[in-house]
A protein has these predicted regions:
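Short, well-ordered beta-to-alpha junction loops that form the rim of enzyme active sites
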Residues: 97-99, 133-134
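Short beta-strand edge/turn micro-motifs at domain boundaries
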Residues: 113-141
Length: 141
């Protein structure tokens, strides 16, 4: 999953590949898939005001064993991420999109939707060195 960006500038295409790899890691909950996303000293904020999870192995552990700042482990087949890069500047990117959750794996009834804004920073090897998640739910009618 490493996408070397040292020779070239970070692009929308690189960020989209990273987002696709993130969605795959979320689907698999495979430690190696998660590990491949982040730099050794990465920081991950589940919410903007949280103290970050610090270090790749701490991030992997938080994904695989939720608690604390991480919520719960999602049931396979009950969620889907639809994310895309919105802006890329230097080694920073903003991604936007939705994460949809269904009541069960049949995906017949939507339980909730989150609108996402992710602030991302990448190192020269194309790994995320800083991740901050902002999300909101639809307005109530």
């Amino acid at each position: 999953m490493s996408h070397d960006v040292t020779a070239t500038k970070l692009t929308h295409e690189h960020v989209q590949r990273w987002l696709d790899d993130y969605a795959k890691a979320w689907d698999t909950y495979d430690g190696d898939d998660v590990r491949a996303l982040f730099s050794r000293d990465a920081e991950y904020r589940w919410h903007p005001a949280d103290d970050p999870e610090k270090g790749r192995e701490t991030i992997v552990d938080a994904w695989l064993n939720p608690g604390g700042n991480a919520s719960t482990r999602d049931v396979p087949g009950t969620y889907k991420a639809d994310l895309r890069p919105f802006a890329v500047d230097g080694n920073r990117a903003v991604a936007v999109g939705t994460c949809t959750y269904w009541t069960d794996a049949t995906r017949s009834k939507v339980e909730r939707i989150y609108y996402n804004n992710w602030l991302l920073e990448f190192d020269d090897d194309g790994k995320c060195s800083s991740f901050t998640e902002y999300y909101m739910t639809p307005r109530k009618s």
